[in-house]
From Swiss-Prot:
UniProt organism field: Kocuria rhizophila (strain ATCC 9341 / DSM 348 / NBRC 103217 / DC2201)
InterPro entries found in the cross-reference section: EFG_II, EFG_III, EFG_III/V, EFG_IV, EFG_V, EFG_V-like, EFTu-like_2, G_TR_CS
The protein's name: Elongation factor G
Gene3D superfamilies linked to this entry: 3.30.230.10, 3.30.70.240, Elongation Factor G (Translational Gtpase), domain 3 (3.30.70.870), P-loop containing nucleotide triphosphate hydrolases (3.40.50.300), Translation factors (2.40.30.10)
Lineage of origin: Bacteria, Bacillati, Actinomycetota, Actinomycetes, Micrococcales
Compartment annotation: Cytoplasm
Length: 704
């Protein structure tokens, strides 16, 4: 189905659907596609037939792993949607989609309210200043409570909710919503699955009597919030005049786009209720590419020189590659957001991040994993391109004669590793291909060679992340491999400063020798600092020639990678080169690199080195009767309980627990609570390992 790409950017919305893992995000997206006429049959997540979940494992596990991009039309607006995963192991997918969106719909579970993962995704959206509307889903669920969910948006997210609708009925009796702008009731008829039109039709009625007082109260709050944001409206409001519907809508739009408040709507995507008014809200309140600030970047040779690009098809071409995926027929698909200008298939563009020219092959607008070919791409839209061989996630593509480097994305380092060993020589080649393709797609998937064991190790953001990557290797790339037990990504650091550590590297063997003398001071950096390593040059009077200074820095960094105590990389160090000496003939870059490496080993041993481990923020929701067992179990895993609170019929326990103690936790939790408790965890910080535990790890690593 060929769809036109809208050139009037006022009528374009680039949005993401974001939420906790089970809030019903993919179902909501499916309904959007159904009502906007792209899907003629509804896909259900629990049937494994969902359009947006197109990878085999997504359909099996019923969770969204990669963010599929889709374009659809509502009234005469074009909505480009990215469906993002809600599982914490896939933060990279959420980060990269938020980077290129203009707005988002945050989906909440009407029974659970704001859950840990919703909080994480919300904070990521704050980081990129993405305006949002909230959709309280699953209003048909037992125990659903709209007002509780609105309270948690305030209390857990610290956000200002702007309630635009109230639910009519609850649980099985949920039939529709009160629209507080028009002060009418919207009611969906039909059975629980909707009638023949699958909830596509709803009736506008008068507000039920039992809701009239509450609706009037919430309407007043809404009008007051809108009036406060605009002096003219405030005057009108204080003068006792009614605000018109258009004025209220314009006020809500202003509050939303500036992220001062977040409109809240409700419904049940699964029961086909409330989706169309939510689409109206996307169009009415979320920004177009013209409403957001110009995208910033810097000049190719000077990071200090700030440059901007405006959403204008006639401007110089600038786009950001935000995802790379393997396609069964086309090979590598690169998803890009075009910020300014336009480009045609077959044209050359510049990858200004890498300084390489790229030729664009075919261009598509995507519908999940189906492609709609287009001849030209232009500002304000999201596309997929083929033929970009050197482009990876976070790279900028720009006009060769007017280059810019857009702000890239930063991704967290992996916290968990497994060794992977191909079964045959043929598998070795397949494994190399798989690793190359998967690491191009996913920047949080890392590969390294363990020098001691000679094994290939892959790293990721959690057990589920690595499970799925290994599963993809077997399924998509037909790799047969043995996979080891998960290993924790420990780190090392120093705790005290050491002043002026001397090291002289001297070697005299026939012909020219090697000579380098350095004096370096080391001090610890806080582990939450932006940079975990700093190098300063405080040498005066040319005692170490300028050309050798980077070699000292590289030598120190090389030694840090090899560790002090147990061979784990060292972080949190500031090194200052204070003094040194050189020889006209025998000094070289290599000699100073070796001296840098050795002075670090010497200094670090004296600087009270310690082992660090990743701590995970764990949240457990458990019925009250199992609370004691859950807390006792977390304590036995060296957990520190942070808080306990009541949340709709269950207890919520928050704790910080070392990752090394969390393997296999889900099985233990199920057996202790008869399967009634659920948990989520995400990386929090690195923390010092207790002495007794550290000694065990060090001995094991040294093979003692």
């Amino acid at each position: 189905m060929a769809l036109d790409v809208l050139t009037d950017l006022k009528k374009v919305r680039n949005i993401g659907i974001m939420a906790h893992i089970d809030a019903g995000k993919t179902t909501t997206t499916e309904r959007i596609l159904f009502y906007t006429g792209i899907n003629h049959k509804l896909g259900e997540t629990h049937d494994g037939a969902s359009t947006m979940d197109w990878m085999a494992q997504e359909q099996e596990r019923g969770i969204t792993i990669t963010s599929a991009a889709t374009s659809c039309y509502w009234h005469d607006y074009q909505i480009n949607i990215i469906d993002t995963p809600g599982h914490v192991d896939f933060t990279v997918e959420v980060e990269r989609s938020l980077r290129v969106l203009d707005g988002a719909v945050a989906v909440f579970d009407g029974k659970e309210g704001v859950e840990p993962q919703s909080e994480t995704v919300w904070r990521q959206a704050d980081k990129y200043e993405v305006p949002r509307i909230c959709f309280v889903n699953k209003m048909d669920k037992l125990g659903a409570d709209f007002y509780f969910t609105v309270d948690t948006i305030k209390s857990r997210l610290g956000a200002t909710p702007l309630v635009l609708q109230l639910p009519i009925g609850a649980e099985n009796d949920f039939v529709g919503v009160v629209d507080l702008i028009t002060m009418k009731a919207l009611v969906w008829e039909g059975d629980s699955k909707g009638d023949v039109s699958l909830g596509a039709k709803y009736e506008t009625r008068e507000i039920p009597e039992d809701l009239q007082d509450r609706a009037a109260e919430y309407r007043n709050q809404l009008v007051e919030a809108v009036a406060e944001a605009d002096d003219e409206l405030m005057e009108k409001y204080l003068g006792g005049e009614e605000l018109t519907e258009d004025e209220i809508k314009a006020g809500i739009r202003k509050l939303t786009i500036t992220s001062q408040a977040y409109p809240v709507l409700c419904g049940s995507a699964f029961k086909n209720r409330g989706v169309q008014p939510m689409l109206d809200a996307v169009v009415d309140y979320l920004p177009s590419p013209l409403d957001v600030e110009d995208v910033q970047g810097h000049a190719i040779n000077d990071e200090e020189e700030v440059m901007t690009r405006t959403a204008d098809a006639d401007g110089p071409f600038a786009a950001l590659a935000f995802k790379v995926a393997s396609h069964p027929f086309y090979g590598q698909l690169t998803y890009i957001r075009v910020y300014s200008g336009k480009a045609k298939a077959g044209e050359q563009v510049m990858n200004s991040t890498k300084g390489k020219r790229e030729r664009i092959g075919k261009l598509f607008q995507m519908h999940s994993n189906k492609e709609n070919p287009v001849e030209e791409i232009s500002a304000g839209h999201i596309y997929a391109a083929i033929g970009l061989k050197d482009t990876t996630t976070g790279d900028t593509l720009s006009d060769p004669s007017n280059q810019i480097v857009l702000e890239s994305m930063s991704f967290p380092a992996p916290v968990i590793f497994v060794a992977i060993e191909p079964k045959t020589k043929g598998d070795q080649e397949k494994l190399s291909t798989a690793i190359q393709k998967l690491s191009a797609e996913d920047p949080t998937f890392t590969v390294s060679l363990n020098d001691e064991t000679g094994q290939t190790e892959i790293g990721g953001m959690g057990e589920l992340h690595l499970d799925i990557l290994v599963d993809r290797m077997k399924r998509e790339f037909k790799v047969e491999a043995n996979v080891g037990k998960p290993q924790v990504a420990y780190r090392e650091t120093i705790k005290k400063a050491v002043e002026k550590v001397d090291y002289t590297h001297k070697k005299q063997t026939g012909g020219s020798g090697q000579f380098a003398k350095v004096q370096v001071s080391f001090e610890p950096l806080p582990l939450d600092a932006e940079e975990l390593y700093e190098f300063d040059n405080a040498v005066t009077g040319g005692r170490v020639p300028r050309e050798y200074i980077p070699s000292v820095d590289h030598g120190i960094q090389d030694a840090m990678q090899l560790g002090i105590l147990a061979g784990y990389p060292v972080v949190g160090v500031k090194a200052t080169l204070v003094d040194g000496a050189y020889h006209d003939v025998d000094s070289s870059e290599m000699a100073f690199k070796i001296a840098g490496s050795m002075v670090f080993k010497e200094g670090a041993r004296r600087a009270n080195p310690v082992l660090l481990e990743p701590l995970m923020a764990v949240e457990v929701r458990t019925p009250e009767e199992y609370m004691g067992d859950v807390i006792g179990d977390l304590n036995s895993r060296r957990g520190q309980i942070q808080s306990m609170e009541d949340v709709t019929g269950v207890k919520l326990v928050s704790a910080l627990v070392p990752l090394s103690e969390m393997f296999g936790y889900i099985g233990d939790l199920r057996s202790k609570t008869q399967g009634r408790a659920v948990y989520s965890m995400q990386f929090d910080s690195y923390s010092e390992v207790p002495k007794a535990v550290a000694e065990e790890i060090i001995q094991k690593n040294r093979g003692e």
